[in-house]
């Protein structure tokens, strides 16, 4: 069976659902699919101008949020390799995963940003704050310049409007090409990295389409509860729904029973 490009599915969904709601932080802002595309493009510009090349590793560690999802999609559609890290991990575990994976950049959430020690990750070129993509740490002039002049560079590249036809993502050349490295919880010492090819991401989406495809349609509201840094949550509460054109809500905090009940009452997923 011929396996289509996973990134082509992401690109098609963004273009097909351009003016529909895509990602919402519960009780916060909503990004439509065209907003996601715009943010992805800005991150691509920052990656390119800071020296990130295809195949470089980019780690992400933070609670579920719209900006986490955008950073993950930007990583894959640029051709870099994503390294999602569970935000519940202890700082030493996070340091070890970043170092072991040879990550060049690290995206961090608000809590993780206060817990990690950049000096324990000496090969990182930069740490980026997920809520606004500002720089927590920059160790290269190119990264600093790229972030400080990001809006200017975006305006030069797209002087009038950013349109559907500008969405042109990296397409993996082989389904066995490495897409991400997913680290286990480390029940016997430090976490172990699992190499996840693009075909695995596509395969999960294809399985979900077979099982849920007739029940979930574009525009449906979905609440994401499981961590996206975990393969199950990523595959079945994020990637499949994004490809379908759904509207995904993130609680952005610990999903207690009270919060879940309130969110279900308001969103009616």
Say what each PLM segment does:
Residues 37-42, 163, 175, 194-215:
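Conserved structural elements of the adenylate-forming
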Residues 18-19, 147-183, 190, 215-221:
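Conserved pre-ATP/AMP-binding loop-to-beta segment of ANL
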Residues 9-32, 188:
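AMP-dependent adenylate-forming
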Residues 2, 21-73, 90-95, 198:
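Conserved AMP-binding/adenylate-forming core of the ANL superfamily
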Residues 202-221, 228-269:
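Conserved AMP-binding/adenylation subdomain of ANL enzymes
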Residues 56-57, 63-83, 87-91, 99-105, ...:
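A short helix-loop-beta submotif of the ANL/AMP-binding
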Residues 9, 50, 77-156:
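Structural core segment of the AMP-binding/adenylate-forming
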Residues 11, 44, 94-95, 170, ...:
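Short hydrophobic/charged patches on amphipathic alpha-helices used for structural packing
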């Amino acid at each position: 069976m011929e396996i289509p490009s996973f990134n082509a599915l992401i690109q098609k969904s963004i273009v097909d659902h351009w003016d529909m709601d895509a990602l919402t932080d519960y009780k916060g802002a909503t990004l439509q699919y065209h907003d996601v595309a715009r943010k992805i493009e800005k991150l691509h510009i920052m990656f390119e101008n800071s020296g990130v090349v295809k195949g470089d590793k980019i780690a992400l560690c933070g609670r579920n949020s719209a900006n986490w999802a955008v950073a993950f999609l930007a990583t894959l559609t640029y051709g870099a390799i994503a390294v999602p890290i569970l935000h519940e991990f202890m700082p030493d575990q996070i340091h070890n995963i970043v170092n072991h994976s040879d990550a060049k950049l690290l995206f961090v959430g608000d809590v993780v940003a206060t817990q990690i020690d950049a000096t324990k990750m000496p090969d990182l070129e930069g740490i980026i704050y997920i809520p606004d993509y500002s720089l927590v740490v920059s160790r290269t002039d190119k990264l600093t310049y790229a972030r400080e002049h990001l809006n200017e560079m975006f305006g030069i590249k797209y002087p009038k409007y950013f349109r559907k036809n500008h969405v042109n993502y990296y397409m993996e050349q082989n389904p066995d090409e490495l897409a991400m490295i997913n680290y286990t919880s480390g029940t016997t010492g430090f976490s172990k990295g699992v190499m996840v090819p693009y075909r695995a991401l596509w395969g999960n989406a294809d399985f979900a389409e077979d099982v849920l495809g007739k029940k979930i349609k574009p525009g449906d509201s979905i609440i994401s509860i499981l961590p996206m840094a975990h393969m199950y949550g990523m595959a079945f509460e994020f990637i499949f729904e994004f490809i379908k054109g759904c509207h995904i809500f993130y609680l952005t905090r610990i999903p207690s029973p009270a919060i879940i009940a309130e969110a279900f009452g308001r969103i009616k997923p």
